[in-house]
């Protein structure tokens, strides 16, 4: 049974993670040209717009993209085609309402957003122009919920890959031809392109229809708003925390430093996130299905932690060792100051790999208030630590603060959910986490050495040991060896 569980986790992490590798490759090319054409100042401006749009979107989408999935998934499993069509119409109707509402809120709050983020009203026009992004994101969220509810994982993977390609093809010429004047056109066009790709995928089987004039239909969607309440509040708190931090960095220094901070966060978070892509689409439904079965819940969580930690650690060690080269390749030498920040912040992703499967427990059990409380506590700690860290030691202090924030979340979640849900780390899982983290710390220590010969002499054996632990577990707990032999056998024929 355990072997089947490991195979299942690895399968869906591989399916969606493989797509994320392509997504990351496209992002690498896009970010390289973005850095060349608009520099750190331009990236700071892009991130300011994105964080503000995310905040308004999370405040106004009522969590429909999350709350609609469970009911649609149930209808899909029951094979009730007519009910599915009606429910999809309901999702789209409410998504359109929230799209219009969110766009209006962004338009009205444009002066406030400009003053809050940049301490003046000079970018009010910019926030007005990006307001349609809020509406487009709401519509996209509804279509993504439809794909998730219908369990179209392969379609979602294809859209993600194609979306990354289209985004790159729109971004590079946009910044090349227009420079900083291309920021808003690029943001709008890329957001719209991803939305159209999702609409194309869903409308092939379910043509786009809404029922805004049907009061009966609209009233039946009340549960969508209630179920998504905690999710939207948590998202708003998270987006608000990010915006507060980035506004502080901008206002206390400059958009240039905000751009460096944004790149540092991207390097810490974005390229390691492929390990998490199967969480919403695969792990969450399995955890929800466990219900009151404590043993089954704990087994699912521990298996997920095992896979995440063993995938994450070798990647982070390799990333740390070659980080100066990576920064030069992905961006320009202007961004080399972020190397120290990223090295200090890599533990952020490791701790996230450990606690994320545990953090899904209240959502899987329908305990929205507890989920919201935990998110609120984390974001308060995150905001305070990063602001203090940046104030004391600049972007390096911010990197240290990011790691400390997630260490706090790991300890807090583990203690609280052990009491509420009787969650327990399995002894072997806990031992794996400790060993792999010790290897990560050793790898980061080696990465701080300036001499490349000494750095690689000390760091590569650490990386090899981490890879050996990962391979040893996968060899014992999955049929990965048989699959590799099968692929090699087919190629020889």
Model-based region annotation:
Residues 1-9, 198-242, 282-299, 420-434, ...:
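Interhelical loop/hinge segments that connect adjacent transmembrane helices in multipass membrane
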Residues 9, 13, 22, 93-243:
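Hydrophobic transmembrane helix module of multi-pass membrane transport proteins
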Residues 11-31, 43, 163, 187-194, ...:
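Transmembrane helical elements of multi-pass membrane transporters/channels
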Residues 35-42, 151-154, 164-196, 200, ...:
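Membrane-interface helix-loop junctions in multi-pass transport and translocation proteins
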Residues 62-77, 149, 207, 264, ...:
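Helix-loop junctions and terminal segments of transmembrane helices
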Residues 135-159, 346-377, 417, 421:
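Membrane-interface junctions at transmembrane-helix termini in multi-pass inner-membrane proteins
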Residues 445-493:
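Membrane-proximal transmembrane or re-entrant/amphipathic helices at the cytosolic face
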């Amino acid at each position: 049974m355990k072997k089947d569980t490991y195979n299942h986790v690895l399968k869906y992490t591989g399916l969606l993670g493989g797509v994320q590798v392509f997504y990351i490759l496209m992002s690498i090319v896009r970010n390289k040209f973005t850095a060349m054409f608009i520099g750190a100042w331009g990236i700071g401006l892009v991130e300011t717009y994105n964080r503000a749009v995310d905040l308004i979107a999370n405040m106004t989408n009522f969590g429909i993209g999350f709350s609609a999935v469970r009911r649609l998934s149930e209808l899909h499993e029951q094979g009730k085609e007519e009910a599915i069509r009606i429910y999809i119409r309901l999702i789209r109707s409410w998504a359109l309402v929230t799209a219009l509402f969110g766009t209006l809120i962004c338009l009205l709050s444009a002066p406030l957003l400009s003053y809050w983020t940049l301490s003046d009203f000079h970018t009010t026009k910019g926030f007005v122009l990006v307001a349609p992004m809020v509406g487009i994101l709401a519509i996209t969220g509804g279509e993504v919920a439809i794909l998730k509810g219908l369990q179209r994982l392969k379609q979602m993977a294809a859209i993600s890959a194609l979306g990354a390609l289209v985004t790159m093809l729109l971004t590079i010429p946009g910044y090349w031809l227009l420079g900083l004047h291309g920021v808003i056109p690029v943001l709008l066009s890329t957001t719209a392109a991803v939305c159209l790709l999702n609409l194309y995928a869903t409308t092939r089987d379910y043509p786009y229809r809404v029922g805004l004039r049907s009061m009966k239909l609209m009233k039946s969607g009340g549960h969508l708003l209630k179920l998504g309440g905690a999710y939207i509040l948590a998202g708003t708190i998270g987006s608000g925390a990010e915006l507060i931090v980035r506004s502080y960095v901008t206002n206390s220094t400059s958009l240039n430093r905000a751009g460096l901070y944004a790149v540092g966060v991207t390097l810490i978070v974005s390229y390691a996130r492929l390990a998490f892509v199967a969480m919403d689409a695969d792990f969450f439904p399995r955890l929800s299905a466990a219900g009151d079965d404590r043993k089954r819940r704990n087994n699912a969580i521990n298996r997920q932690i095992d896979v995440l930690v063993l995938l994450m650690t070798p990647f982070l060690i390799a990333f740390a060792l070659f980080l100066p080269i990576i920064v030069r390749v992905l961006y320009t030498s202007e961004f080399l100051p972020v190397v120290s920040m990223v090295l200090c912040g890599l533990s952020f992703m490791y701790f996230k790999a450990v606690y994320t499967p545990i953090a899904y427990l209240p959502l899987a059990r329908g305990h929205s208030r507890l989920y919201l409380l935990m998110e609120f506590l984390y974001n308060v700690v995150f905001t305070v630590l990063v602001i203090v860290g940046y104030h004391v030691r600049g972007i390096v202090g911010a990197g240290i603060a990011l790691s400390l924030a997630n260490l706090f979340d790991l300890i807090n979640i583990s203690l609280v959910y052990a009491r509420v849900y009787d969650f327990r780390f399995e002894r072997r899982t806990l031992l794996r986490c400790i060993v792999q983290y010790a290897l990560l710390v050793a790898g980061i220590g080696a990465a701080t050495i300036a001499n490349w010969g000494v750095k690689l002499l000390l760091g590569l054996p650490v990386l090899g040991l981490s890879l050996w632990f990962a391979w040893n577990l996968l060899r014992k707990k999955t049929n990965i060896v048989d699959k590799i032999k099968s692929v090699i056998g087919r190629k020889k024929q």
